[in-house]
């Protein structure tokens, strides 16, 4: 990509973000690095009619700001709905989570709900979870935490 917009609530992550751009031969000064609650940024982007070809969602399973507590199990549908609104038709949303509180089936239900509530259409391009050599013990289902879904917005 020529330009990215990174939104993170944690100011402490700025040096690491800059380092990652440098490692990937991307000019840091040409990237938008925003320290903000992502829900506030999404509202701003909608107001400014900003649209993105690719939106990557990788929130922590649980996070707290001054005004909001984010829980993946409770708030991921809302996060997806906000992302859908700023993704161009034909664009891709990469939805990921490390939350062990719900299954991949539930995660895909979150996606379905978000698109349905906005009367939008989508297709799942790919999905990933832990590799086969990373065994999850049947008595410790929480070990099956990784879920990544590539979603194409159709309209």
Q: Where are the language model's segments positioned?
A:
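A general structural motif
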Residues: 9-13, 37, 72-80
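Helix-to-beta-strand junctions that scaffold the AdoMet/dcAdoMet cofactor pocket
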Residues: 87-89
């Amino acid at each position: 990509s020529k330009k990215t917009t990174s939104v993170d609530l944690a100011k402490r992550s700025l040096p690491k973000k800059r380092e990652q751009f440098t490692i990937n031969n991307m000019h840091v000064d040409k990237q938008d690095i925003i320290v903000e609650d992502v829900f506030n940024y999404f509202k701003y982007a909608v107001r400014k009619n900003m649209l993105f070809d690719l939106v990557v969602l990788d929130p922590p399973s649980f996070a707290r700001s001054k005004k909001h507590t984010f829980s993946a199990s409770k708030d991921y549908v809302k996060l997806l709905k906000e992302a859908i609104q700023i993704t161009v038709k034909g664009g891709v949303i990469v939805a990921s989570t490390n939350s062990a509180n719900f299954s991949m089936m539930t995660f895909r239900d979150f996606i379905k709900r978000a698109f349905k509530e906005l009367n939008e259409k989508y297709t799942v391009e790919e999905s990933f979870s832990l590799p086969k050599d990373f065994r999850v013990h049947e008595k410790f289902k929480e070990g099956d935490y990784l879920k990544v879904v590539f979603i194409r917005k159709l309209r």
